[in-house]
Amino acid sequence: MVKLADITEIIPIPEDVTVTINGSEVTVKGNGGEIKRNFNHNKITISNDEENVTVKVAFPNKKDKAMVGTIRSHISNMIYGVDHGFTYKMKIVYAHFPMTVKVQGKIVTIDNFLGERSPRKAKIIGDDVKVSVKGEDVTITGINKEHVGQTMANIEQATKIKGRDPRIFQDGIYLVDKRQEELE
């Protein structure tokens, strides 16, 4: 099989966003805030000019090709996050025992889940993630897609039902909508 000479991925930078590259650390600043991330990979080089970020690898093997695509996606998500932000919407569902959900600092507390006396807790990941509860709707917003997604998963996993038939006991907090929305 013939090896490719190089693979280059180009990511456009919007006008409101600034990308700074220091070695393998990429910093993206925009209206929503700032995200830093270290992409330490031996063969891959990341460079930028005013308009584009370039991710390049010379004589790649299969893993290097995959890593170039992964780094491109991460940088694209960072740029989109600081420019627009990410919003996940969840719905509180219960049949008999009305659960109450509260945000206390960096913890989401779920009381009275299936009538349990002890509250269930979910951790909010990252400093930029905001969780709000209005009625039966839970909204998670932030600029880092990974932190927003992991916080959503933590809340969903906190209400996982064990030892009961999941076809009957469908109480929980479930993802309803994933959106990339404009920052206010």
UniProtKB/Swiss-Prot annotation:
GO terms for cellular component: cytosolic large ribosomal subunit. Signal peptide: none annotated. It comes from the Archaea. Coiled coil: none annotated. Keywords: Ribonucleoprotein, Ribosomal protein, RNA-binding, rRNA-binding. One of its GO terms (biological process) is cytoplasmic translation. SUPFAM superfamilies: Ribosomal protein L6 (SSF56053). One of its GO terms (molecular function) is rRNA binding. Belongs to the universal ribosomal protein uL6 family. Part of the 50S ribosomal subunit. This protein binds to the 23S rRNA, and is important in its secondary structure. It is located near the subunit interface in the base of the L7/L12 stalk, and near the tRNA binding site of the peptidyltransferase center. PANTHER family: 60S RIBOSOMAL PROTEIN L9, 60S/50S RIBOSOMAL PROTEIN L6/L9. This is Large ribosomal subunit protein uL6. It comes from Methanosphaera stadtmanae (strain ATCC 43021 / DSM 3091 / JCM 11832 / MCB-3).
